[in-house]
Amino acid sequence: THGTTYGGNLLASVVAEAVLDVVNQPEVLAGVQERHQWFRNRLEKIGQQYGVFKEIRGLGLLLGCVMSESWAGRAGEIMKAAHDEGAMVLIAGPDVLRLAPSLVITEEETRMGLDALERAVVKLATQSKAA
């Protein structure tokens, strides 16, 4: 069978256990839930305002923004435009924009990143109307 190069490494296992000890603390989990709401609220607002997302899904800070029918297949375009605006987002196929921010991202960093994402959506929406 195939495994990973470092999968059985004792050091990697100890580090993973230490990370889980920190991440599973109640105050860390509460912070993740709070940050989840920051993202979800703003992404839903962007989706409604520009008709770009039909659904925001995910748990914690791993979020997927499913493209609406009018934006179908354009997740890659949004990813590139967001990068041009200074936000790092990912895709999960042609119809899902994926966000996976740090568990300790600040409210200001969240606002800045989502402002950049919104600017990207506005630029693409403007280009689509002009075409």
Predicted regions span which residues?
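Conserved N-terminal phosphate-binding loop of PLP-dependent enzymes in the Aspartate aminotransferase
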Residues: 1-131
